């Protein structure tokens, strides 16, 4: 990586956690990812969810159809785990290079997760098959019991689900997605080479005070929810350390403005347009730009056993204002950091 004062040149990054939705929303948001990233792990929580090879192939084609000419982008598809999923279907998709990984949503943990897994025991045959064939498990790590406080759900998941699972299936490769707590940062750092994590830009840049003090900011509301500043700091320190089993996963999750700005708003930040510059800002603030390229472009492929991208992009350090909104067919999207001045952006 070369780092003159105003330009950062890095190997083309990948996004290891992305929501593209479907229909008009898909067509609107895909270019914001495909112009920057070489690959992205695409989440399967559509309605209905992507649970078959056939559905994944069809969804992949809809994504590719939305990629503008001149963009070189490969969507990496995932299978949505359910209590009734056939292990043979999962293995077939993996062997045919349709499924790159499988996604575990605890039932009702987040958007379109009502079909999710009710207990680990219910999907043990599937997980055992994944361990056998070397297929990564991507985990939304929150318990969803009604009596557990929303700010405690990730920490409780580690002790009650994640650790027992990894003790039982010791060879299973696991990505602890969008970690938000010191508990998770410590757990991943102390884990072995079969455990990795992704972190979003919002969880590195903000804590729950930013979302709640002086008025509720619905465009910072995502799941897992922003935590207190000691957790934010632990995440920042983890990425700044150069730890190689943590990598870029934006969890970019678009919702139309009226679904975010409502009396019962949806969870998710549409950060695809601004995420890479946001990460660069954090690494610069932490005096860790020497680790930025690995976080964006090397650590993920290394964990997944994939080659790194062979092209490069440049970020430029000059102030730019983020658009207030992005047109959607009959509504608008509000991007992460809308209307704000940002320090780093991708050089066009």
From Swiss-Prot:
Disulfide bonds: none
Residue numbers binding substrate: 19-21, 45, 140, 223, 255, 267
Binding site for Zn(2+) 2: 103, 140, 178
Needed cofactors: Zn(2+)
Residues binding Zn(2+) 1, per UniProt: 17, 19, 103, 251
Cofactor note: Binds 2 Zn(2+) ions per subunit.
Entry keyword set: Hydrolase, Metal-binding, Pyrimidine biosynthesis, Zinc
GO cellular component: cytosol
Catalysis performed (reactions): (S)-dihydroorotate + H2O = N-carbamoyl-L-aspartate + H(+)
Pathway involvement of the protein, from the record: Pyrimidine metabolism; UMP biosynthesis via de novo pathway; (S)-dihydroorotate from bicarbonate: step 3/3
Any one of the GO BP annotations: 'de novo' pyrimidine nucleobase biosynthetic process
Gene3D superfamilies membership: Metal-dependent hydrolases (3.20.20.140)
Residues the record marks as active site: 251
Subunit structure: Homodimer.
Function: Catalyzes the reversible cyclization of carbamoyl aspartate to dihydroorotate.
Identification of the protein by name: Dihydroorotase
Species, as recorded: Shigella flexneri
Gene label: pyrC
């Amino acid at each position: 990586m070369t780092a003159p004062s105003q330009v950062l040149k890095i190997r083309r990054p990948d996004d290891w956690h992305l929501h593209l939705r479907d229909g008009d929303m898909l067509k609107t948001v895909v270019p914001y990812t495909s112009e920057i990233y070489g690959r992205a792990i695409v989440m399967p929580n559509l309605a209905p969810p992507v649970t078959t090879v056939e559905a994944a192939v069809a969804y992949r084609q809809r994504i590719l159809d939305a990629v503008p000419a001149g963009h070189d982008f490969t969507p990496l598809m995932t299978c949505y785990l359910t209590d009734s999923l056939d292990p043979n279907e999962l293995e077939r998709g993996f062997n045919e290079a349709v499924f790159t990984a499988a996604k575990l949503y605890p039932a009702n943990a987040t958007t379109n997760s009502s079909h999710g897994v009710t207990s680990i025991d219910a999907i043990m045959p599937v997980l055992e098959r994944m361990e056998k064939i070397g297929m990564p498990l991507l985990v939304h790590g929150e318990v969803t019991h009604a009596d557990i406080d929303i700010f405690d759900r990730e920490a409780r998941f580690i002790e009650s689900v994640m650790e027992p699972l990894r003790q039982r299936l010791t060879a299973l490769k696991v990505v602890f997605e969008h970690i938000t707590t010191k508990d998770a940062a410590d757990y991943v750092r102390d884990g072995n080479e079969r455990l990795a994590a992704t972190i979003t830009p919002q969880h590195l840049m903000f804590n729950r005070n930013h979302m709640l003090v002086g008025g509720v900011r619905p465009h910072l509301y995502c799941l897992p929810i922003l935590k207190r500043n000691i957790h934010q700091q632990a995440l920042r320190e983890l990425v700044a350390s150069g730890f190689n089993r943590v990598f870029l996963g934006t969890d970019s999750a678009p919702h139309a403005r009226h679904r975010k700005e409502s009396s019962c708003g949806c969870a998710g930040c549409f950060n695809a347009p601004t995420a890479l510059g946001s990460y660069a800002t954090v690494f610069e603030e932490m005096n860790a730009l020497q680790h930025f390229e690995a976080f964006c472009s090397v650590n993920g492929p290394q964990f997944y056993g994939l080659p790194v991208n062979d092209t490069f992009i440049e970020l430029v350090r000059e102030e730019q204002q983020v658009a207030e909104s992005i047109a959607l067919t009959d509504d608008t999207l509000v991007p992460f950091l809308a209307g704000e001045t940002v320090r780093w952006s991708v050089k066009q």
